[in-house]
């Protein structure tokens, strides 16, 4: 498909897009729920507000350079795991079937070999609800796995099996003990 727009008179063009790992109806519902009645500036302001809330969970002192380094690192730390579900709770599981995340937000991109030592304990300290949802997601992965295994390197409804070890056990155990 192709589109041609004549913007020679200086008008701007605003395009809204949405995705779903489930189906096109999910993408359309996501688009409606997340952007209906909002222009680009409104969506941008909401995103900035959410990120400011997330990074303000920790307060640091120091020079502006030190603060910039810290908060940039914290922002990058919090990008993943990512929400992996439609606004109605549906998501494509590790078994490639459609599931409904009831009573939790489903997350993906668990690089547990990289994150079990620091990221998961940090999330547990600064956002206990997100930590709980991440553990629910890990346990859902285990329930959907043909091997009944916790994730090793879970990515968008797939298991990459690309790291050594079984660090999901440490993450789940730590969170359970902290609850």
Indicate where each model-derived feature is located.
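Beta-sandwich/jelly-roll carbohydrate-recognition scaffolds of carbohydrate-active enzymes
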Residues: 1-107, 140
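Alpha-helical support elements that line or immediately flank enzyme active sites
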Residues: 72-85, 108-132, 170-174
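Conserved small/polar residues in nucleotide/adenosyl-binding loops
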Residues: 175-179
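Helix-terminus loop motifs that line ligand-binding clefts
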Residues: 91-95, 99-100, 130-174
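Secondary-structure capping and boundary motifs in well-ordered enzyme cores
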Residues: 65-66, 105-114, 160-168
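Generic recognition of flexible, low-complexity loop/linker segments
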Residues: 2-4, 107-110, 120, 158
């Amino acid at each position: 498909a192709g589109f041609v727009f004549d913007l020679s008179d200086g008008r701007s063009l605003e395009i809204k897009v949405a995705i779903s790992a489930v189906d096109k109806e999910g993408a359309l519902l996501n688009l409606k729920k997340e952007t209906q009645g909002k222009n680009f500036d409104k969506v941008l302001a909401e995103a900035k507000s959410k990120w400011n809330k997330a990074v303000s969970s920790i307060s640091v002192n120091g020079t502006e350079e030190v603060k910039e380094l810290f908060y940039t690192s914290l922002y990058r730390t919090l990008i993943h795991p990512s929400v992996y579900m439609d606004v109605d709770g549906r998501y494509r599981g590790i078994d490639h079937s459609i599931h409904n995340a009831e009573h939790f937000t489903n997350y993906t991109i668990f690089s547990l070999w990289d994150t079990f030592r620091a990221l998961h304990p940090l999330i547990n300290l600064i956002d206990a609800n997100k930590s709980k949802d991440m553990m629910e997601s890990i346990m859902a992965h285990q329930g959907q796995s043909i091997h009944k295994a916790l994730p090793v390197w879970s990515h968008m409804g797939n298991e990459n099996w690309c790291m050594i070890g079984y660090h999901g056990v440490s993450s789940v155990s730590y969170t359970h003990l902290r609850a």
